[in-house]
Amino acid sequence: MKLVTFTQSGKQSYGFVDNDTITDIGQMLASTHPDLKSLIGDDYAKLISSSADTAPRVALSDVQLLPPITNPDKIICVGLNYESHRKETGRPEVEFPTLFTRFANSQIGDGEAMWQPAESTSFDYEGELAVIIGSGGWKIPEDKALEHVAGYSCYNDGSVRDWQRH
């Protein structure tokens, strides 16, 4: 299921995509689940199926897509997490990948422009895979880790390489 957060006519909502249509379940669940983040913490498949038949539909072409989770608690990124990228950057081998943060206000929606500081001469952008955690935990065994994943998303990443230190 492709879940999305979007705006239409200045109003934010969320839903799921089916071909070229979004089923706007946010309109149906707004009183208890005002955004997608609050929905994925619950038994969201059951909630979606219970409201899908009566939810309004909107054309995908009539909305502006936003980041799926517009208000994340944390954005934890992993740098140098695969060997070919490490070699490409000329970095030495490391035992553990580098972790760094992003902030919610640095996210952009589909088709939005990325912000580049005028002071940078080495702005780099690339597509990344975002893993959206639906339920937290501590010291989760590897064989149980995917039980905590709510979904995946494409993610725009912009880096000011001349300021980067890792």
Segments from the language model and where they lie:
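N-terminal non-catalytic cap/leader segment that marks the start of a structured domain
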Residues: 1-97
